[in-house]
Every structure is written in structure tokens, then in C-alpha cells.
Amino acid sequence: MLNPIVRKFQYGQHIVTLETGIMARQATAAVLTSMDDTTVFVTVVGQKKLQTEQKFFPMTVNYQERTYAAGRIPGGFFRREGRPSENEILIARLIDRPIRPLFPKRFFNEVQIIATVVSLNPQVNPDIVAIIGASAALSISGMPFLGPIGAARIGYINNQYILNPNVNEIKSSSLDLIISGTEESVLMVEAEANMLTEEQIINAINYGHEQQKIVIKNIEHFAKKVKIPVWEQCLYPVNDDLEKRIIEISEQEIVKAYNIFDKVIRLDVLDKIKSKAIEIIISEYSGIDEFEITSIISNIERKIVRNRVLKNRIRIDGRNKDEIRTLDVRTGVLPRVHGSALFTRGETQSLVSVTLGTSRDAQNLDELLGDKTDNFLFHYNFPPYAVGEIGMVGSPKRREIGHGKLAKRSILAVMPKLDLFPYTIRIVSEITESNGSSSMASVCGASLALMDAGVPISNAIAGIAMGLIKEGDDFVVLTDILGDEDHLGDMDFKISGSKKGITALQMDIKVKGITNEIMKLALYQAKNARIHILNIMKKSLNVPRKDISIFAPRIHTIKINPEKIKDVIGKGGSVIRMLTEETGTTIEIEDDGTVKISAVMQEKAKCAIQRIKEITAEVEVGSVYTGKVTRIVDFGAFVSIGIGKEGLVHISQIAHKRVDKVSDHLRLHQEIFVKVLEVDRQGRLRLSIKGAK
């Protein structure tokens, strides 16, 4: 017998429904979550038995969109969904980020969350629904999940904050912010903004956090109705004696190691300390594996680093809390590339290239919310050599896709409109060195490379990553964090923008109690850092170059009569194909008669434009044209006076005297002058040679 448990509540302009007990009853937990007609089915499965060889938390989140949800059949040969799209990967990360910190540190049981979109209202984005569903499913799973969490999308329209704006409203909003957190704390923020101030962003976060508490309360009521299975103690045990012994062996040496500011030398010393500790412990204890030893050493490192920052205000590399690493900015570093920059911040370095293409190079996206074309691409690559490691090289991982999306959002607000700069633009960031904040280095490098390419961006953009060390009421906000400060700290807060305002931010918080004061301090400290970086960037390249690269295609736009499009294309595309081959250009025609001609060489583009003008020109009766004989027949000759325009010179119009044989007066391909005598209703031309003399 199926016994559904249902909870409905009003959430902004939408009705949210949580339902369990009907489907996927063999899963640890399953919740059908709806916001109006957008429905996401979320399942959670957890392995109660701990695999002894597992020494990490193996949680995976899969988000998948089914095309039947939108009443469509997938494209492609197989007519079924394939590997995850970029959008699916990004939403899976959105679900993962606020959930992962809410599991205990030593919980290593395998967990899988699958969120499947099964119904779609085109006006309701399923990402918020998926986060709410995952929170509800985990809350009734019996796992040691320290939730529930809520989630909200916040827009900013006409100086008003909007809770969960629909898809159309987002298009006119100057803010698209997603927030997720518990009753007490914000855990995750992801935002794209159009030059908003720090105060506006803070208010949006506060508004969103307050509103999402409605979700938390309703999930708590929902969970009370469900018979939740009780999990036995499943945390990996702590060996106190072992911890004391390792502290005796290693603590003082680790303290000395962290007096070394050079990362490579410091890591080499720390590796030797770990190896020594492992050797001693294995000889003294039986049944102890390396993970237990290195885990304890990592905790010792964490305490040492955090204490140095909180008590002595000394960071790992010796900087002050608000000090930025040494910057090195170079542009035009790749000679044949349309635009390039090398941005170095300490031990983090990004090589950024910009390529300009035509609308044919745009990416066609087959998304659940509808098909669209993207003329701005941003790809982020993180090879293993960037951190001195050996690893697999291949298709981008989730992290690379996420960082690329953040960098793209950072730049989007300053990109020129397509009608002003009709290029498809691809930015690629190659991370050649990394010690924290590589995505923000990509933003800075991208801004410089765009200006080097002559792209008329409205403002230069810079990005900075902020961190936090917090113990009780004592805290320090760190500017331009290192990789270790991110790993050992309590917050990763990336902010990008111009001198005018913020364009994007991403915040992940690992602890409770992040106050308004802390967030405000982080935002304003980041603003100072951003302005400092922009001033350094300005010295290298202040404004976009006046012209694009000589190696980039020039795009020329002309307008023709839409009724003449068929003449330019020709039968089966014959005319446009001949034009592109003969002139070496790319020609694109839109339904409204807009024609875009692109070529690297200016002369070729001018030639193509002239030919198109000839084809589309209106033939005037009584005018004389240069023509070429294309066919000779018994009753006259056909003469072309332009591509697609051919007329008949009757035998009686060849000469003033009688003509018995046409070939006695004309030959094939002969150039002659002809006068237009008539254009009939079907557009056919009657020409005269004798009238042109």
C-alpha cells in the first residue's frame, strides 16, 4: 500500500510541494519536489557499511534533465539523453556545495544524490527546486546530516529585491543571486550582477537568507511526519593516543616548516616530516595505516596555521592580512593570437587568449528551457603541471567547468552588444601555475586579453579571492588567499568587478556564525584589493586597442532588400557558394536582409560587398550595363549583367542591319554593352545591343 506524505507551502510567488512514500522506496530517501509545474525527483542512497579502505567522504551529486519534462524528444542520432551538459554539471555543483560541509568530518560512508527533472514550467528554473529536494531527502534519510538547508534565487528589479523571479523577470534583473544556508548561517552564494555596490549585494544576501528560512521550517515539519531510519554510529574512530604521539614527534618541526615562506621548499620539508612520522609510528604501533597518520598531521598543520594568523597576524607566506601578492602583467604575449595576456599573482599564473570568430562559430545550446545561441565562450583549463603533479589530461572536469562559468559571469556585464561588435568571442585561460585563486587570475587575464584583442569592453574587470580564519568571536579576513589558506580556512569568497561595482561573486562557507560584519568587511576589503589590481593592470593596457588584430577576421555588415535574399543565395546555394569561393570570404545572411561579410583581408571583403551590391541592385529600364554572353541560340543570345541577372538579346536587337546567324556577331563569354528595354512581371530582362551603341 502506497502511503504518500505531502507538505505544501507558499514560497514567494510559487507553491512548493514535497512528497515522499510513492516512488523509489528502495532508495535510502526519495522526495518529489515541485515549484508550480517544475518538478524534480531527488533520491539519496547511502551505504551504511563503511569500507575500511575509504579514507575520504565519497559523496557524488548527479543532476539530470530529461527532455520529456519539457515535452520534447532529444536530438542526435540515438534520440536519448547522453553525457551531462555543462548546465547539468553546474547545477550539480550548486547542490553539492552547501550540502557537503554539513556532514561530520570523519563520515566516510558513500553517498549518492540524484536529482532528475521530470516536469518543467519554462518560467521556473529547476535549480532551486533541486537544492530544496536534496535538502528534504537528506533530512529524512537518517544520515548524520546537519541540515536542513534552504535555497532562494534573488533578483533586483527597479531597486526592489525579488524572491525567486521567473525566467522572464531574470532577463530584466541587474542581479541573479542564488543563496543556500541553514537557519543560522549562509553556506553558499553564487551571483552575477550588473555593477552593483557592496551594500546592495549584502542586502541581497540578507534578504535571501531570511526568505529561505521558510523552506527550512517546512522541511523540518515534513521530516517529522516521516519515519526516519536510525543509522548506527558511523564516524571513523579517533585514536587519541596516536594523536598525542604524533604531536610529540612532529609539532615543533611543523611550526619551523611554516616559517619557510617559499611554497616549494616548505612542501618539501613537510613531506620529509610526514615520512619521518610515518616511519616512527609504523615501527611503534601495529595495524595503523598511513591515512591515520597523515590525517592527524594535517590537523596539526591546520591548528598551527590558524593560530599564527589569529594570534600573530602572520600568514603562510609572511604577508599582512590585506596584502596582495606581487603582480606581473603582460599583454600581446602570443604573436599570432587575436588577443593575449599573461597575468601572474605570486605563484598563480594564467595565460589567456582571445579568439574572434563569426556567428557561425557561436555555440548552439539545446537546453531544457529552450534552444539558444551563445556568442561568448569562456574555457578554463587546469593542467596537472600547474601544481607540479602528473595527472590525466583530457576533457574538462567539473571544477574546470565551474571556474570557467564564474569567470564568464565576471566579464559578461562589460561585453559589447552583438549589434555593435558582431563577433563570436572565445576566451581560453590556461593555468600555468597555481597557488590559490586561479579563477580570479583568469578574470584579470581575460580583461587584459580582450582589450589586447580590440574588443570594446566598457570597463576593465579584476577578481580577488578572500578567506577567513575564525575561532569563536575572533576572526581575520584574508585578502588574496593561497591554496593552503583556502584549504585550512573557513571561507572561500571570490569577488570580481570594476571600479564601479561588482559583476560576480561566489562564496562557500565551512563554519557557522558568519556575521554581517564579516561579510561586509570581506566585500569592502575585496573592493580595495580590486582597485589596486585594476591600477596595476592599467599600467600595462589602459583601454581596448583601437583596431582588432591583423590576423582576425573583419566583419562588414550591409543591408539588402529581403526579397533579394534568394538572388544572393541562388538555386541550391549556388550563388553564395561561388561568391565565398571566389572572394575567400564568409557570408552570412539573416531573414531581415542583414548580410555579414567576414574576411581577414580587407580587399576580399570589399570585393564580396561589391558583388552582392551588383546582385541586389534594381535593374533600371533604359540603363546601359556591361554584360557577358552566356548562351547563344538561334533566336538571339542570353547575356548576364550580374550574378543571377540574365536577359535575352533578341536576334533583331543585335545590330542595326539584318542578322542571319547570331554566332557571326557574338561569341561565348564575350563582354558587351547592353541596354535594358524591359523587365516583365516575372523579372525577366529584354536587352538590346544596338540600343546601347
Curated annotation (Swiss-Prot):
Catalysed reaction, written as an equation: RNA(n+1) + phosphate = RNA(n) + a ribonucleoside 5'-diphosphate
Domain S1 motif residue range list: 622-690
CDD domains, per the entry: KH-I_PNPase (cd02393), RNase_PH_PNPase_1 (cd11363), RNase_PH_PNPase_2 (cd11364), S1_PNPase (cd04472)
Catalytic activity, EC: 2.7.7.8
Keywords: Cytoplasm, Magnesium, Metal-binding, Nucleotidyltransferase, RNA-binding, Transferase
GO molecular function: 3'-5'-RNA exonuclease activity; magnesium ion binding; polyribonucleotide nucleotidyltransferase activity; RNA binding
Positions of the KH domain: 553-612
Top-level class of the enzyme under EC nomenclature: transferase
Family per record: Belongs to the polyribonucleotide nucleotidyltransferase family.
Cited PANTHER family: POLYRIBONUCLEOTIDE NUCLEOTIDYLTRANSFERASE, POLYRIBONUCLEOTIDE NUCLEOTIDYLTRANSFERASE 1, MITOCHONDRIAL
Subunit and interaction comment: Component of the RNA degradosome, which is a multiprotein complex involved in RNA processing and mRNA degradation.
The name this protein goes by in its record: Polyribonucleotide nucleotidyltransferase
